[in-house]
UniProtKB/Swiss-Prot annotation:
SUPFAM superfamilies: Anticodon-binding domain of a subclass of class I aminoacyl-tRNA synthetases, Methionyl-tRNA synthetase (MetRS), Zn-domain, Nucleic acid-binding proteins, Nucleotidylyl transferase
Source species of the chain: Shigella sonnei (strain Ss046)
Cofactor detail note: Binds 1 zinc ion per subunit.
Keywords tagged on the record: Aminoacyl-tRNA synthetase, ATP-binding, Cytoplasm, Ligase, Metal-binding, Nucleotide-binding, Protein biosynthesis, RNA-binding, tRNA-binding, Zinc
Record's protein name: Methionine--tRNA ligase
Motif ('HIGH' region): 15-25
Name of the gene this protein is made from: metG
Residues reported in the UniProt entry to bind ATP: 336
């Protein structure tokens, strides 16, 4: 079906320029790249851009620690980031930096328009100040307890647990991250963006149906709690752009960071001597499409502040936000001590890029779900799918074609109806790529691969090859297998760019989406060379060990639970006495339908029953084994309403998480209801 060519601008969230790219970052960049490559295959004009987020106090302080200028540090980090993305074959048209002249000009332009339109407000605020370091403390350099959900150890601008945003002065028991000192209050004039003025527009945008349901629901919560004016200025010393006509005041990093999307595209247009496209893509009434691939941790900034800034400065809003979840490794948060905090460059020293691209793609959907990189499953899936199903289809047929027919395929299809089944799948698979239902696309493709291999098994060319007078049958069977391989590789081209290059070299033709409608008949292929090698767990072991060694080299040689989870600040005996710990008997334990993390526990406190949800399913895959066991619970924790019911307390467990978590039990003789003292 012929499609009308679209103009599309695609971005990934800008990596912060004070650290290396790791496998968590790569999920987003791979997801976006697969989608972009598919769009290009369908004939659309796609500009795929990114940049380093290069401003802020963390950059300034790290450069000071290294004894170099911030400019030198971000320059070196940009080269490292670009090398990593190139290693994973992320097909950016441009990779720039927010510390650029284009970004400065655009930041000042947007700010001036917002100010002219009455959306910038000035007022004096009381701000946290580090008396030991002699500096105002930016949001991320204050930590304390979230004022909304009371989660400890949260940054000064937003809570990573509940997603709330707030002022650093709202933190409970704040501490300076720089010195550990308790901050004091000092007055300073700041500039605020009047976000509440855009509430009606943002709510209409939310209800348009374009956003993911989970994003729209979260935004509705923020609307109900009320939008607040947003502080867009920071005091010197600060590494960033100084605000025009405001000496000593700088744009907050989150103001100029998303403008970096525009800056990178402007830089690309200038490189092309293109004076038209920037306005064509960013003007208010643009018909081009604009998509931001982002993680769920920065939805607030992209769904509220960014579209409001664009609206208030007379630029177009994003067409959509494509939001993804986090990456876990082996069922747990990435851990430096366990060697599962893996840098992109370390991965490429042990595996190829296509393997991770395939595994992530096979697990991704359009939902905001976390993705688990199970390294054992990774090895099994890559070998089973890429090697055994796809590549093997070519190798088991190519030998006969090369040796017996000088590489020339048959002039007719052996099974036209089977070939039509494969090409008819283009609509379903294409729609899955388009809608970011990547896992569905992979399942459809692998089902076809099974069908193709079943055909070859049934036709048994190795038997036909030994039978006199059946050369034509042999050529037809093997040509059919190679044509089916071509269709499969065409569908997988957005995912496996390097394997695609090798497949195209063998097939002696470029793989195009529409090209599969015409099979390769009477076509000469090149001599077959191994397309892909099997992988094994020894490579995984080497990868994990290398990651551990990198951590040792980069930090103090202290490893273990205390290194991963340092002891919290001292509390008083009175604080501890508020927590009522009791012995509880586990009367029943069962899975929670709809959750892959929770168990539902029925606890007997010696006269009172409690229903508790606990995230220990990975560690206890057989919940029945817990029945009859004694454990320790927090008995006076306020009940918490969850999607699955109300949790009436918390059981105590130790360990880093995932499968490595251990339920606490008292010594023999302890009875349900006994208080822990």
């Amino acid at each position: 079906m012929t499609q009308v060519a679209k103009k599309i601008l695609v971005t990934c969230a800008l990596p912060y320029a004070n650290g290396s790219i790791h496998l968590g970052h790569m999920l987003e960049h791979i997801q976006a790249d697969v989608w972009v490559r598919y769009q290009r295959m369908r004939g659309h004009e796609v500009n795929f851009i990114c940049a380093d987020d290069a401003h802020g106090t963390p950059i300034m302080l790290k450069a000071q620690q290294l004894g170099i200028t911030p400019e030198q540090m971000i320059g070196e980090m940009s080269q490292e980031h670009q090398t990593d993305f190139a290693g994973f074959n992320i097909s950016y048209d441009n990779y720039h930096s927010t510390h650029s002249e284009e970004n400065r000009q655009l930041s000042e332009l947007i700010y001036s328009r917002l100010k002219e339109n009455g959306f910038i407000k000035n007022r004096t605020i009381s701000q946290l100040y580090d008396p030991e370091k002699g500096m105002f403390l930016p949001d991320r350099f204050v930590k304390g307890t979230c004022p909304k959900c009371k989660s400890p150890d949260q940054y000064g601008d937003n809570c990573e647990v509940c997603g709330a945003t707030y002022s650093p002065t709202e933190l409970i028991e704040p501490k300076s991250v720089v010195s550990g000192a308790t901050p004091v209050m000092r007055d300073s004039e700041h500039f605020f963006f009047d976000l509440p003025s855009f509430s009606e527009m943002l709510q209409a945008w939310t209800r348009s149906g374009a956003l993911q349901e989970q994003v729209a629901n979260k935004m509705q919560e923020w609307f109900e709690s009320g939008l607040q004016q947003w502080d867009i200025s920071r005091d010197a010393p600060y590494f960033g752009f100084e605000i025009p006509n405001a000496p000593g005041k700088y744009f907050y990093v989150w103001l100029d960071a998303p403008i970096g999307y525009m800056g990178s595209f402007k830089n690309l247009c200038d490189k092309r001597s293109d004076s038209v496209s920037f306005d064509e893509y960013w003007k208010k009434d643009s018909t081009a499409e604009l998509y931001h691939f982002i993680g769920k941790d920065i939805v607030y900034f992209h769904s509220l502040f960014w579209p409001a800034m664009l609206e208030g400065s007379n630029f177009r809003k994003p067409t959509n936000l494509f939001v993804h979840g986090y990456v876990t490794v082996n069922g747990a948060k990435m851990s430096k001590s366990r060697g599962t905090f893996i840098k992109a460059s370390t991965w490429l020293n042990h595996f190829d890029a296509d393997s991770l691209r395939y595994y992530y793609t096979a697990k991704l959907s359009s939902r905001i779900d976390d993705i688990d990189l199970n390294l054992e499953d990774f090895v099994q899936r890559v070998n089973a799918d890429i090697v055994n199903k796809v590549v093997n289809l070519a190798s088991r047929n190519a030998g006969f074609i090369n040796k017996r027919f000088d590489g020339v395929l048959a002039s007719e299809l052996a099974d036209p109806q089977l070939y039509k089944t494969f090409t008819d799948a283009a609509e379903v698979i294409g729609e899955a790529w388009e809608s970011r239902e990547f896992g569905k696309a992979v399942r459809e493709i692998m089902a076809l691969a099974d069908l193709a291999n079943r055909y070859v098994d049934e036709q048994a060319p190795w038997v036909v090859a030994k039978q006199e007078g059946r050369d034509a049958d042999l050529q037809a069977i093997c040509s059919m297998g190679i044509n089916l391989f071509r269709v499969l590789m065409t569908y997988l081209k957005p995912v496996l760019p390097k394997l695609t290059e090798r497949a195209e070299a063998f097939l002696n033709t470029e793989l195009t989406w529409d090209g599969i409608q015409q099979p390769l008949l009477g076509h000469k292929v090149n001599p077959f060379k191994a397309l892909y090698n099997r992988i094994d767990m020894k490579q995984v072991e080497a990868l994990v060990e290398a990651s551990k060694e990198e951590v040792k080299a980069a930090a103090a040689p202290v490893t273990g639970p205390l290194a991963d989870d340092p002891i919290q600040e001292t509390i008083t005996f009175d604080d501890f006495a508020k927590v009522d710990l009791r012995v509880a008997l586990i009367e029943n334990a069962e899975f929670v339908e709809g959750s892959d993390k929770l168990l539902r526990l029925t606890l007997d406190l010696g006269g009172e029953k409690r229903n508790v949800f606990s995230g220990i399913r990975s560690a206890y895959p057989d919940p029945q084994a817990l029945i009859g066991r004694h454990t320790i619970m927090v008995a006076n924790l306020a009940p918490r309403k969850m999607r699955f019911g109300i949790s009436e307390g918390m059981v105590m467990a130790a360990g880093p998480g995932g499968k490595d978590i251990f339920l606490l039990s008292p010594d023999a003789g302890a009875k349900p209801g006994h208080q822990v003292k």
